[in-house]
């Protein structure tokens, strides 16, 4: 049985340099290799012309460069593209490319499904199977960049921003998310500014503290409710890490970070007559008074079977004005890709649910149906 080859997309620069040293090669060769992979989109060692022929042969015998394949894609009328990425065993995660005039953002997944159970999120309703590997995380960027088109002669990439806001809770996969983001930030990797890489979390506080100790990227926090009582329902991880504990973790992260320019982005999904009253706006403003932030109001994007509706524009406008009265910077997010279910909260993928969440939900619905009838 042949030895399994090392997928080089799994290795950040430190690990890749260690591999080259182990192979009896100069560590700087790792930098050259990374440039070929991430700047020029090359996966064939024979195309790496500044690496000598003997080393190319050694690499081909021991290593491979394999990103997960694109199974299918859909393009929205607004230019947004949703990709289904095949991660094996018949499972897919979803990745979304969002082009704008001055940037091109890729929304990347970190898990097959999600271990959390936020009640307004389509991904959460699909259950959870496993964490994605480093290669599967950076491979989403690599594969989409290849699809859109690397500029081979300059190394210019078609993706300028990455947001870890796809399927999954990134802080529950720190082992793989940290080296993946290292590759995103590395000058020999995707060479993105730390202000152009954003991690979004629902509030796994110990992991947030650990992230702040080792990496500096922009942070977005999923608040979605102005008090613990409502957040316990909408974002059940709140029962373990309630708002004050989460806000303390956020402030500690901001204190360590340069990428956030002294403040964090608060994400707040607008659910009709659930969390969008003017009283709740006052409550949210008071909650955030000691945490430097800008607030991103996200019109809810319905999915099949969703128990919630989208707040009206007038309710969003009133909510926004209350927050601004407190001096908060408020942005109402422009919905992108909702016609192809690629908008915030709509990603679902194709998942083998190890949590049996879908089965339990179906059983509960059947029991309700029997009771009603």
Curated annotation (Swiss-Prot):
Co-factor remark? Binds 1 [4Fe-4S] cluster. The cluster is coordinated with 3 cysteines and an exchangeable S-adenosyl-L-methionine.
The record lists its disulfide bonds as 107-344
Signal peptide limits:
none
PROSITE patterns linked: RADICAL_SAM
Cellular component GO terms held in the UniProt record: cytoplasm
Where in the cell?
Cytoplasm
Matches recorded under InterPro entries: Aldolase_TIM (IPR013785), Methyltransferase_A (IPR040072), RlmN_N (IPR048641), RNA_MTrfase_RlmN (IPR027492), rRNA_lsu_MTrfase_RlmN/Cfr (IPR004383), rSAM (IPR007197)
User: Origin, by domain of life?
Assistant: Bacteria
The positions flagged as active site in the entry are 94 (proton acceptor), 344 (s-methylcysteine intermediate)
Q: Name one GO biological process term.
A: tRNA methylation
The protein's matches in CDD domains, at most eight in alphabetical order, are given as: Radical_SAM
Q: Which residues form the Radical SAM core domain?
A: 100-339
What's its EC? 2.1.1.192
Question: What is this enzyme's catalytic activity, as reactions?
Answer: adenosine(2503) in 23S rRNA + 2 reduced [2Fe-2S]-[ferredoxin] + 2 S-adenosyl-L-methionine = 2-methyladenosine(2503) in 23S rRNA + 5'-deoxyadenosine + L-methionine + 2 oxidized [2Fe-2S]-[ferredoxin] + S-adenosyl-L-homocysteine; adenosine(37) in tRNA + 2 reduced [2Fe-2S]-[ferredoxin] + 2 S-adenosyl-L-methionine = 2-methyladenosine(37) in tRNA + 5'-deoxyadenosine + L-methionine + 2 oxidized [2Fe-2S]-[ferredoxin] + S-adenosyl-L-homocysteine
Which cofactor(s) does the record list?
Answer: [4Fe-4S] cluster
| SUPFAM superfamilies assigned | Radical SAM enzymes
Which residues does [4Fe-4S] cluster bind?
A: 114, 118, 121
Instruction: Name the chain's protein.
Output: Dual-specificity RNA methyltransferase RlmN
Give the encoding gene's name.
rlmN
